[in-house]
């Protein structure tokens, strides 16, 4: 198995996981050029992708859906609310026959990888984390979450690899165009 964190943070997120029979990208928040360059360093080529899983609709996770989908035959796995939010941007630019709607706590089998979306807490339409089972390993991807539900603690403790992505920049928050009530909630203890 090969796992490559291509980017993590407010400027863009993307994680690549490859097994013997599957090549999957989780989020596409960085440019096509950057994705291609970083994968090529490991002799991985974008046109080999089988699937793209999207955690939620924010641009640091979705900004480059269209160019990446254009360069692959990959299926796009996304929840309905995030897709609906993105529809004005991606309408007529993605073949909807390649879109698979996903729900929390359901298993999705892609060749030799099982992906189970889990519910997270974030200011988005419907954020999902991912529990992945591949090659006798358990991998968790938990990004942009304020709270992890207690019901997931035991599952996350069983992960061989757990990606937790979070950042908290007070100045960036205060300078943002978010509503004051939201800023206060985020800054609260």
Task: Give the ranges of each region predicted by the language model.
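Conserved beta-strand hairpin/beta-sheet module of binuclear metal-dependent hydrolase folds
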Residues: 1-42, 126-144
């Amino acid at each position: 198995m090969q796992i490559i964190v291509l980017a993590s943070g407010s400027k863009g997120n993307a994680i690549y996981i490859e097994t013997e029979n599957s090549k999957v990208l989780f989020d596409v928040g960085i440019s096509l050029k950057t994705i291609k360059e970083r994968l090529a360093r490991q002799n991985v080529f974008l046109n080999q992708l089988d699937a793209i899983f999207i955690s939620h609709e924010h641009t640091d996770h979705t900004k480059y859906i269209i160019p990446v989908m254009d360069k692959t035959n990959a299926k796009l796995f996304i929840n309905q609310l995030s897709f609906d939010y993105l529809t004005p941007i991606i309408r007529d630019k993605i073949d909807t026959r390649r879109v698979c709607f996903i729900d929390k706590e359901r298993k999705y089998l892609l060749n030799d990888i099982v992906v189970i979306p889990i519910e997270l807490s974030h200011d988005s339409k419907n954020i999902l984390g991912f529990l992945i089972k591949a090659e006798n390993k358990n991998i968790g991807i938990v990004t942009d979450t304020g709270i992890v539900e207690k019901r997931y603690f035991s599952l996350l403790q069983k992960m061989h690899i757990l990606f937790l992505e979070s950042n908290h920049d007070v100045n960036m928050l205060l300078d943002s165009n978010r509503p004051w009530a939201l800023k206060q909630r985020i800054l609260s203890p």
